[in-house]
Design a protein with these regions (language model features):
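Transmembrane helical cores of multi-pass secondary ion antiporters/exchangers
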Residues: 1-440, 444-445, 449-450, 454-457, ...
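Cytosolic regulatory regions of ion transport systems
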Residues: 186-187, 268, 352, 361-365, ...
């Protein structure tokens, strides 16, 4: 972690100094010293915030505020310092615009349509429900607590609070390796839908300065929609017929790809600005066109510093803007800020629980999804900033909104760190989401006794192989999963030997109800370390001779599981390497034209067979 922080600091410092060189040459050398001090201070604060498990963007906002206070911006505006700091207002405004464009571009690069197309109906129902209910609630909260006036001010205020942060959602899921979990897919899909809505309204804000009603507004909205659709079509055509071969060539050099990505981003943004379309929306869709290429992971790796650099420019200058406001706008609205922050942090998980209860997701999934998305977004901070500059937000509304957004980042990060403790504290109130069939019902409906049975926790390739083995022996297996789509699939497979049970595999009452201690084999196919340790302890106390097998992707977790009396650990990399060793020994001595051909063909057939057997849920496994 420390190496990553120092590397990012070095890269961003180099970019900052490079950007400041023309200013220095033009007589603006006063900028380099404070810029270096700000970035150095931000590095120290970032290390502290990382230790406190907070988003590092807060460090740049803090240093921006410190810079503004040092300049005395609370008592005088930027224009009053022109004589001593020539061009400062223009330079900071330019830095901010560059930061906004780069953040929007990288948001587009990281935008993955597969996040919503994998479970299109499920994600859309939850995501649209979340955004819709959130807009209604926070529209009311904006008028009730913040005192917004008019439709434009209230709806933009609500939008800025309802859309989750792609930065924080992605970081949280990656840290816990939950990207492919059901709650991770719900959180990511909701963020994707909210981001799309935010970009569309951002384009509307840039085009007309707000949201009006009437016939003229309907015509302008129609024209704006046509412009956005045309922009999307053009960048997608560029992506398919021009970018793909160009990027394939540029991947040979990280420097070429980096410079070309910056040029492409700024070029599309400039063209959109000249045509009257939002440059920010243009940069976002340019990022999508680049991120949709087959080389997405390579592109993200090589142009990743753009994200950090853009965030630094944006949030440093945002801090300066915040310090430019009258301090009384913050102090006089402390109660409003705290109230709205608590509403964001508390109400958004409740909305996920409400929307999640319709497709019958389990309480743990709903709570974890809600805790992951209960913050404002960096993109909506951009909207708030632009709305303030466009006159849609007053100084007071802007001060309230930015304060609420930043406080929601802090509280949300703390909540994500303690998300399992939060769930355990509130799960007693959510029993209505967790009604499970009893062991008696499973025995009655499927003829499966809860003794000497096989238990599979979660469904994936490992459980597929175990189930196939017992199907050949004519035995049924009990498969427990929290994914409603997988459960519905096996409920429809009347001839399958898999008996599906829709339940929370981390709920210890399930272990007793379905008599895990009387099973002949328990296989945990999810790499949930703490749950597997607790289940191992439960089985060791109840039935020490029962074989318990667990799956993990981590070597460290494998050793810890063995230390906690798990009988056998399927460490996927280890198993893959051992399996490949056998294939390697079998194929390597064949002539080059035949080497690995038979094994590859057999692997292709086996994978196709799995896909054909699983049908629609193949992409979910």
């Amino acid at each position: 972690m420390n190496k990553s922080i120092f590397y990012r600091f070095a890269v961003t410092l180099a970019f900052g100094l490079l950007a400041a060189m023309p200013v220095y040459a033009g007589g603006g050398g006063w900028l380099i010293k404070p810029l270096g001090l700000m970035l150095g201070g931000a590095m120290v604060i970032t290390i502290i915030l990382t230790w406190l498990k907070q988003a590092n963007i807060l460090s740049f906002i803090i240093m921006g505020i410190v810079m503004g206070l040092a300049l005395g911006l609370q008592t005088s505006g930027l224009a009053d310092h022109e004589s001593h700091y020539p061009g400062m207002a223009s330079i900071l405004s330019g830095f901010q615009e560059i930061g906004i464009i780069l953040v929007m571009f990288m948001a587009g690069v990281n935008f993955n349509l597969k996040d919503i197309t994998k479970r299109l109906g499920f994600i859309i129902s939850n995501g649209v429900g979340f955004i819709g209910l959130g807009l209604l609630f926070f529209y009311w909260a904006a008028t009730r607590f913040a005192g917004t006036e008019g439709f434009s001010e209230s709806i933009f205020f609500a939008l800025c609070l309802v859309v989750p942060s792609s930065f924080l959602v992605s970081a949280s899921l990656q840290y816990r390796e939950d990207e492919d979990s059901l709650h991770g897919q719900i959180a990511t899909g909701t963020t994707v839908i909210g981001t799309l809505l935010a970009v569309v309204l951002l384009a509307k804000l840039q085009a007309t300065g707000g949201l009006d009603s009437g016939a003229s507004s309907a015509v302008s909205n129609l024209w704006l929609t046509e412009q956005i659709l045309l922009l999307v079509v053009i960048v997608m055509l560029i992506s398919k017929f021009i970018l793909e071969p160009v990027v394939r060539y540029l991947l040979r050099s990280s420097e070429l790809l980096f410079i070309s990505a910056v040029g492409y981003c700024m070029g599309i943004a400039a063209i959109c600005g000249a045509l009257g379309i939002s440059p920010e929306a243009g940069a976002f869709f340019a990022g999508i066109s680049l991120g949709s290429l087959p080389y997405r992971l390579d592109i993200e790796d090589k142009v990743g510093p753009l994200k950090s650099f853009g965030a630094i420019l944006l949030f440093l200058t945002l801090g300066v803007n915040m310090s430019d406001l009258d301090g009384s706008l913050y102090s006089n609205n402390v109660g409003v800020i705290i109230t709205l922050t608590l509403l964001v942090v508390i109400i958004k998980p409740i909305i996920v629980i409400i929307t999640g209860s319709l497709p019958n997701i389990k309480s743990r999934t709903a709570v974890l999804g809600g805790v992951t998305t209960n913050q404002a977004s960096e993109i909506t901070i951009i909207i708030a900033l632009l709305a303030w500059k466009a006159g849609v937000f007053s100084d007071e509304i802007f001060a309230i909104l930015i304060s609420v957004s930043l406080l929601s980042f802090i509280l949300s990060a703390l909540g994500q760190w303690a998300q399992f403790s939060l769930f355990n504290g509130f799960k007693g109130m959510l029993h209505f989401m967790d009604r499970n069939p009893s062991a008696f019902e499973i025995t009655r409906d499927h003829g499966m006794e809860m003794k000497d049975h096989v238990v599979l926790l979660a469904y994936n390739e490992v459980s597929y192989e175990v189930a196939e083995y017992y199907q050949q022996k004519g035995e049924k297996v009990l498969m427990i999963d929290t994914d409603p789509e997988i459960i519905r699939h096996f409920q429809a497979q009347k001839e399958s030997n898999i008996v599906p049970l829709y339940a929370d595999i981390m709920d210890s009452s399930i272990w007793s109800e379905f008599k895990f201690d009387q099973a002949k084999l328990v296989v945990s196919c999810r790499g949930l370390l703490q749950m597997n340790i607790e289940l191992s302890d439960f089985l060791r106390q109840k039935s020490p001779d029962l074989p318990f097998v667990a799956v993990t992707t981590s070597h460290e977790d494998a050793l810890e599981l063995y230390d906690n009396n798990v009988r056998y650990v399927v460490q996927t990399d280890y198993m893959a390497s051992k399996s490949f060793r056998d294939v390697f020994a079998k194929e390597i001595d064949k002539p080059g034209a035949e080497s690995f051909g038979d094994s590859g063909s057999q692997h292709w057939k086996d994978t196709r067979a799995i896909r054909d057997n699983l049908g629609e849920i193949f992409k979910l496994v």
